[in-house]
């Protein structure tokens, strides 16, 4: 230390004090510009209470871009949300069930469509059943049907098939084979449904029994729909739910940031592909 002190031209006692001085605790970082984003972040969190900071960041940047303002880094949004207690509680539970290593994602749209049925239980005990079909690549829900008090029928699935083909191809027959992935429920496996699918150019594919993971795209959508829509809206009875469902599906397709699409919505992704 004497040699270093001589080279630097300072007293040894001063150098010793600098080396052994306790490091001052670093205060929390607070950038003035962060506070300008806080009202926007609070509003988005109030509107989307199930969204984590990455999806909130996507929505923040969507609004900033519309106003011609520069994007906010996700770390900045995280910092603001953490400082103001707006972060979601981290999930620490183990994922139940077996792991699935099969490939469920395809490389372009209109190669595989995934279909499934799920239920929403209303506060009065009534049950709404929903059948839907979603594209495995761009994640847009192509068609859906909802009923209360009854099960999903084969005719509903066939209507779904026709609506999806008409939406994507503007005709009643797909120009190439499209896989239709579902479970082994009777509405999907009925002979009339299989024959109808073939006439439309669809190729029915079925997951193994008791393996919902094999239809991972559809399974993930059901979790998203229940978490981000059904659980945060009033569900007093079936009539109320049925009145809201169309708006939920449209919001998912148009606005929901999807991690598999780079945090943009399915329709934003489709529009980006078309340009």
Per-region residue spans from a language model:
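Charged DNA-binding/catalytic regions of mobile-element recombinases
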Residues: 1-275
